[in-house]
Amino acid sequence: MRVWELGQARLMVAGAFGNLAVHHHAAVQVGVGLAGPLSVTADDDAHHTCRLVVVASGKRHAVQSDSRSEALSIYLGPHTWQGIALRTLSRTRGVWIVGNGERLADATAAALAVGGPRAAADFLVGELCGMSSADPDGRGWVHPQLRQAIDLVSSSAPSRIDLASVAGAVALSPDYLGRLCKQQTGVSFSATTRWVRLLTALRYLADGMPVTDAAHLAGFTDGSHANRVCWEMAGAAPSDLARALKDSPLPSHPAP
């Protein structure tokens, strides 16, 4: 498994994903089967086979690939205009099986091979967002103070993060910020902070740090706390993610 930071609240993960439990997270996820199909399970026990899927933030799901076929997942911040646009397109059922996904999946694989992770993500997310009427500047979609609050949470990890202090920093009441977060992103403020911590831990794991140390540095109270959040939001144990990163034939690195 390889991980790339793409900037603008985007993260890309590549590898073979199997045996994932149904889970949910604060990001909007775009899953691509680069050379073969994906198996998608939703919380209503619906099963789909496809090459390209978009999962709304907060939707319980599991996206898996054949062990011999590499898949790609792009995670978009729920407060970004791309995240909002794709969540809107997938909002009806929470899981959007993209029509004509084979064409876009093949084109994404080609973009990855030629231009690298950032080029592949820019191409695919741009194509998908082109199907939405969302404003590229995000105006009218995300409350500016909510965007500011989520950016603050992301930049504050692994320090202590609580709703009251973040609300005060963006001049909103805690109750209003909590409601706004749920209304506009589909996930609670606390789920957003747990997701940020998990991503922080994943970055440490990608650097080869032991699970316990990564959990501590990411701000989890202890190993069991990190384990619960990892199962909740990734569908696997931290040790499984660490093993997948270690066994990758290519090291994780920032996207070019």
Where are these regions (language model features)?
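Short, charged, intrinsically disordered terminal tails
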Residues: A85-R87, S132-D137, E232, D240-A255
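Amphipathic alpha-helical segments enriched in hydrophobic/aromatic residues interleaved with Lys/Arg
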Residues: T80-Q145, A149-D151
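Terminal helix-turn-helix DNA-binding modules in bacterial transcription factors
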Residues: R160-A164, Q183-T221, N227, A244-P256
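N-terminal regulatory/effector-sensing and dimerization cores
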Residues: M1-R91
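Basic, amphipathic alpha-helical hairpins
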Residues: A111-L112, C129-A134, A149-I161, C181, ...
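Short, Lys/Arg-enriched anionic-surface-contact patches
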Residues: S132-Q145, R179, T185-V196
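Key DNA-contact positions within bacterial/archaeal DNA-binding proteins
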Residues: D175, S224
